[in-house]
Amino acid sequence: MPDGRRVRAGELVAVYRDNGAIDGQFRYLSSYLDDPEAFPLDPVNLPLVPGPQDVGRPQAGVHGVFEDALPDDWGRRMLCRQYGLSDHQARPPHLLSLMRGGGMGALLFAREHCPVQETVERPPMVLQDVARAALDFEKGELKDNDPLLPYLYGVGTSPGGARPKFLFAMDDGKHFLVKLPSLRDTVSPVPIEAACLATAADCGFSVARSRLLDEGLA
């Protein structure tokens, strides 16, 4: 909420049809509607009204604002590997339930009566080792018994995005979103993004602090 409180906003329901379509609905909880700080999660498609609101997106089964809270290609493949999901199982309603209150942003998701995962303190890691493991995962070469795989599950699914990335605590204790080159790149976008951020800062825009690191991963 705007005042920092964490509250339950509503409930998602998904019914899977034999033809592969998903009938989805969302409804705000009355406690949320009665909250003076309540705001619509999607002003256009999810106004603050009581009762179920149909999704109308049979392939996704959830409103767009909720699907946007999921990771894209990179993070979804991480979730599928972590939970052994088939393509049929890797649909937005099921993926959202696996987040268990994790992820980034203002919206958190968990299955009803399922405990929300607790934030755990992760041991310090060497950036180059984690980056190498992330690239091995993209190549399909990261083995199930690799000691860095559980670490990647913890730091690589929540940031989302279609490209390899993970959260990492630097030596100074600052957390950075580490973005890596992809095997599918014909030109590495990493230095280009860094240059764009630097240019925006020079023009007076407020941008995130960034570093361009060469970890010898080419």
Model regions and ranges:
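Phosphate/dinucleotide-binding and metal-coordinating scaffold of catalytic cores
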Residues: 1-218
